[in-house]
Amino acid sequence: MSREQRGPNEKLGTVLALAGISNAGLARRVNDLGAQRGLTLRYDKTSVARWVAKGMVPQGAAPHLIAAAIGAKLGRPVPLHEIGLADADPAPEVGLAFPRDVGEAVRSATELYRLDLAGRRGGGGIWQSLAGSFSVSAYATPASRWLITPADPSVARDPTAAQAAILGARGGGSGSPGGAGARGPGAAPDARGAHLLHPGGATPGAAGSVPLQPGPEAVADASPLRVGHSDVSKLREAAQDARRWDSKYGGGDWRSSMVPECLRVDAAPLLLGSYTDEVGRALFGASAELTRLAGWMAFDTGQQEAAQRYYIQALRLARAAADVPLGGYVLASMSLQATYRGFADEGVDLAQAAVERNRGLATARTMSFFRLVEARAHAKAGDAPAAGAALKGAESWLERSRAGDSDPPWLGFYGYDRFAADAAECYRDLKAPRQVRRFTEQALSRPTEEFVRSHGLRLVVSAVAELESGNLDAACAAGTRAVEVAGRISSARTTEYVRDLLHRLEPYGDEPRVAELRERARPLLVTPG
């Protein structure tokens, strides 16, 4: 469906001519990009002619897909306003900026937190309308700016600047969705105590662990908070809880979904407060951890557009924290997303940026993880020698790590079992089933209760390796266990792995074992991940 504009869209016509894309070629590319994102689109050259000659504006994700298709041909990002479709975007550029100024960085992050709130209150409409807008080229500027300057010189904010920031947030920045409604109660709450982790130490799932919704009185006073180390500690505790919930229950579980709420209710007013440089660095670090987690959870639930925006803001906050290893961790997350979305070369670049900037700074275990992420990208690109070298480097760094090293808390998930699991996926992409089986056996030998999702993913990789080795019985057995695990968590990524396994089993569809596995997986595949 399309809605009408006034007059021809000359901007779109001009850019199409510049890119050398025909109407039929653009329609075909938009349909293909939509299919990659689970959308069924049937545009043709006549559709494109209407967009250009009559100014018709396609609805839903189409404007972003058009921009992505043209951007891929031009080799650079193409914003919607350049192709005359800015009005189609409910949140133009929100979360995609990587400001040089610290104050603008705070504004950019808190705008994103409000955007996510508006999306949730509207039934996810904003993220649905942005479906298909993920563009790996949007990572280019953030990555290059971070590489040049991985740490801001000062982040202290005095009360006067903090008060101005609060008033600015209340007024709503450009691009805030929903007009006044998005700038109402909750835009810049001014009260402590509504923490994801209850101050009294409530356990996950208890009523006190849910962030409180601030009422109108919460923003009645523009007096800025004076942020202290205790405030930062509560954010770090929240991040620790969220990491545990995500690993155990998946990014779509209700516990994990409270992270964006924590950012809006708890982190935003602190970021808009006043603080010394020392406290500010710690605050930006804790906020960066939570923001990266929000991106990771969005990635796990298939919301690639939200994930990309959170990752960009997390990288900017890590720069303000002067935490180079954390910035590298965000780049590694970007790399994994780019690789997963089919942009392996860009995934290599992002991972290598994390590695090179952290030489002499990060712990051995941290460097090992960055090299492992690099290996994943090389393997996806089909570069076996480069993947092997990166895996060897990752293993070497891991062997050099020691229990007493000052590893960051966010790396608690990483050990030899995770190395083995990712090595197995590398060899799966390189079509080396014998190596896949060897590393998968090692990965599955560890306890699974804390990392349920990872266990499910490893079982699927094991099933694929068994299938490629000609062991149908073993493949179905591992697949059955994977389906059982996937049914216990909320993870679109895990469901996608299961779907891929079933696709690989289609040539054996007449086998009773395969039919039984498909039947077991049916409830999982019809339930939103």
From Swiss-Prot:
Residues 167-226 are annotated as: Disordered. One of its GO terms (biological process) is sporulation resulting in formation of a cellular spore. Residues 13-31 bind DNA. InterPro entries: TPR-like_helical_dom_sf (IPR011990). It comes from the Bacteria. Might be a catalyst/regulator pair of proteins involved in the temporal controlled sporulation process. The decrease in level of the smaller protein early in sporulation may relieve negative regulation of the activity of the larger protein. This is 55.5 kDa and 49.5 kDa sporulation proteins.
